[in-house]
Amino acid sequence: MQPSQIIAIAALVVAAIIAIVVWTIVFIEYRRIKRQRKIDCIIDRIRERAEDSGNESEGDREELSKLVEMGHHAPWDIDDL
């Protein structure tokens, strides 16, 4: 093999590695943005229900807790939204 062929193959390998890294980062950011939109939607729904009825929906609060991976471990009501 000539040196130019070796350089071309090495360049293709490096380009493939860079492409994989970039698309992995894009995919991770896409999932993060999608999850954040879902959280924002649930928070908006909780606010609307709180305005309408004067209290929040427990189902929405539980769903939000699952999404943000936090739970209420205290036996009393904590309004930290």
From Swiss-Prot:
Alphabetical keyword list: AIDS, Apoptosis, Host membrane, Host-virus interaction, Inhibition of host innate immune response by virus, Inhibition of host tetherin by virus, Ion channel, Ion transport, Membrane, Phosphoprotein, Transmembrane, Transmembrane helix, Transport, Viral immunoevasion
Keyword Cell inner membrane: no
Side Extracellular, residues: 1-7
Places the protein is found: Host membrane
GO biological process: receptor catabolic process; symbiont-mediated suppression of host innate immune response; symbiont-mediated suppression of host type I interferon-mediated signaling pathway; symbiont-mediated-mediated suppression of host tetherin activity; viral release from host cell
More info: HIV-1 lineages are divided in three main groups, M (for Major), O (for Outlier), and N (for New, or Non-M, Non-O). The vast majority of strains found worldwide belong to the group M. Group O seems to be endemic to and largely confined to Cameroon and neighboring countries in West Central Africa, where these viruses represent a small minority of HIV-1 strains. The group N is represented by a limited number of isolates from Cameroonian persons. The group M is further subdivided in 9 clades or subtypes (A to D, F to H, J and K).
Name of the protein in its database record: Protein Vpu
Annotated source species: Human immunodeficiency virus type 1 group M subtype D (isolate Z2/CDC-Z34) (HIV-1)
